Amino acid sequence: MRDKVTGARRWVVKIGSALLTADGRGLDRAAMAVWVKQMVALREQGVELVLVSSGAVAAGMSRLGWTSRPSAMHELQAAAAIGQMALVQAWESSFAEHGRRTAQILLTHDDLSDRKRYLNARSTLRTLVGLDVIPVINENDTVVTDEIRFGDNDTLAALVANLVEADLLVILTDRDGMYTADPRHNPDAELIHEARADDPALDAVAGGVGGALGRGGMQTKLRASRLAARSGAHTVIVGGAIEQVLARLKAGERLGTLLAPERGLLAARKQWLAGHLQTRGTLVLDAGAVKALSQDRKSLLPVGVKAVQGSFRRGEMVVCVAPDGREVARGLVNYSALEAQKIIGQPSDAIEKLLGYVDEPELVHRDNLILV
């Protein structure tokens, strides 16, 4: 499986806060210079690179003299606004020493939830990569709200991997990879070298939360690998403290945990749907509709829906669940929640009579539906 790493043409590299800051005392410029040297070496070997960089909040905290991460959103956003300036300048100057150009891109979930903005972001990123520019991406913490935040840069990195159709996502962390148990408490814990991203056994060993400076624990990294797998990308979760880790991965060394995609590539629109994490409501299906979606790959018709939950507008994302509450699919609805309430359980040819008009015969078309 390691040939998937050595042969990967396009990498998304995510570096966490703990690897970019000096124990919370601001940005570690020396450490950043080491990362840049490794990435430049990869680029010289023909690898196309996109960097997802944490560290803005941590850098801002240092400049403000804060020793612990604040919980109030406005304080976090203030720290991010201050720290982002330092972060992007540090990356720019360090890459410039090697004659490499960088570009800053700040994203929110809204940017990727809207189809038009998603396509614009994808076009911009691909253009930058084509111009031999290294994009440096972070979440736009200054304007984001709880409702539209990615939650962590692991998730953001996975969505970026989808955007640019990366072959490999490398998540650099303060652990050497995923273990069979917590190595801090269990001396018998063993490193998991390779696994399928969708292996349910991984959930049991991925517990825990992020550190004081960051938001993402091992569970978020596992979720990120599964999201990246939707577009066919492999993911390596590996320790950033390992000397020359990127070069050694490129050389085929068996470092960290390599998680392989569980299925083939999704079509471009389905990739976007897979990364569309914000849902606005729920449709409860009957057994026949579950079969139609899961086995027959058909569209969801009103007749197969038993209940509508939540408030949503036409074109928004909803969750489709089985009678037992198990999530079956997600998709973009053709009718609002109020409209759906009036037509569920009814045949499609009754929609016009019930609403006075008919937009689509399906509640969710199969092209706008992804199984989970």
UniProtKB/Swiss-Prot annotation:
Pfam families tied to this protein: AA_kinase, PUA
Gene Ontology MF terms in the entry: ATP binding; glutamate 5-kinase activity; RNA binding
Positions annotated to bind ATP: 14, 173-174
PUA domain sequence ranges: 280-358
CDD domains in alphabetical order: AAK_G5K_ProB, PUA_G5K
Xref: SUPFAM superfamilies: Carbamate kinase-like (SSF53633), PUA domain-like (SSF88697)
UniProt binding sites for substrate: 54, 141, 153
Pathway: Amino-acid biosynthesis; L-proline biosynthesis; L-glutamate 5-semialdehyde from L-glutamate: step 1/2
EC number, as in UniProt: 2.7.2.11
GO CC field: cytosol
Location relative to the cell: Cytoplasm
Catalytic function, reaction form: L-glutamate + ATP = L-glutamyl 5-phosphate + ADP
SMART domains (alphabetical): PUA
Biological process terms in GO annotation: L-proline biosynthetic process
Keywords, ordered alphabetically: Amino-acid biosynthesis, ATP-binding, Cytoplasm, Kinase, Nucleotide-binding, Proline biosynthesis, Transferase
Family recorded in the similarity comment: Belongs to the glutamate 5-kinase family.
Function: Catalyzes the transfer of a phosphate group to glutamate to form L-glutamate 5-phosphate.
NCBIfam families: proB (TIGR01027)
HAMAP family xref list: ProB
Protein name: Glutamate 5-kinase
Organism the protein comes from: Ectopseudomonas mendocina (strain ymp) (Pseudomonas mendocina)
Organismal lineage: Bacteria, Pseudomonadati, Pseudomonadota, Gammaproteobacteria, Pseudomonadales
